Amino acid sequence: MLSRFLGPRYRELARNWIPTAGMWGTVGAVGLVWATDWRLILDWVPYINGKFKKDD
């Protein structure tokens, strides 16, 4: 579908930039977790969620 709009040059550029964009996305996600309340985000991870039970 995307190849109908992009020529071969731009398809090759997009293919080369996919790993870089993925790495920056990962760095951004880790930075977001670091900058915000990490426990709030990690409560959604099932394995880690069980480790931090709230004592009521």
Swiss-Prot record:
Q: Which residues lie on this side of the membrane: Mitochondrial intermembrane?
A: 39-56
- What membrane topology does this protein have? Single-pass membrane protein
Q: Which residues form a coiled coil?
A: none
Q: Which residues cross the membrane?
A: 17-38
Q: Name one GO cellular component term.
A: mitochondrial inner membrane
User: InterPro entries per the record?
Assistant: Single_a-helix_sf, UQCR
Give me any GO biological process, just one: cellular respiration
Question: Where is the protein localized?
Answer: Mitochondrion inner membrane
Question: Is Transmembrane helix tagged as a keyword?
Answer: yes
Q: Which residues lie on this side of the membrane: Mitochondrial matrix?
A: 1-16
Q: Which domain of life is it from?
A: Eukaryota
UniProt keyword annotations, A-Z: Electron transport, Membrane, Mitochondrion, Mitochondrion inner membrane, Respiratory chain, Transmembrane, Transmembrane helix, Transport
User: What is said about its interaction partners and assembly?
Assistant: Component of the ubiquinol-cytochrome c oxidoreductase (cytochrome b-c1 complex, complex III, CIII), a multisubunit enzyme composed of 11 subunits. The complex is composed of 3 respiratory subunits cytochrome b, cytochrome c1 and Rieske protein UQCRFS1, 2 core protein subunits UQCRC1/QCR1 and UQCRC2/QCR2, and 6 low-molecular weight protein subunits UQCRH/QCR6, UQCRB/QCR7, UQCRQ/QCR8, UQCR10/QCR9, UQCR11/QCR10 and subunit 9, the cleavage product of Rieske protein UQCRFS1.
Q: So what family is this one in?
A: Belongs to the UQCR11/QCR10 family.
What exactly does this protein do?
Component of the ubiquinol-cytochrome c oxidoreductase, a multisubunit transmembrane complex that is part of the mitochondrial electron transport chain which drives oxidative phosphorylation.
Q: What is this protein called?
A: Cytochrome b-c1 complex subunit 10
The taxonomic lineage of its organism, from the top, reads: Eukaryota, Metazoa, Chordata, Craniata, Vertebrata
Gene symbol here is Uqcr11
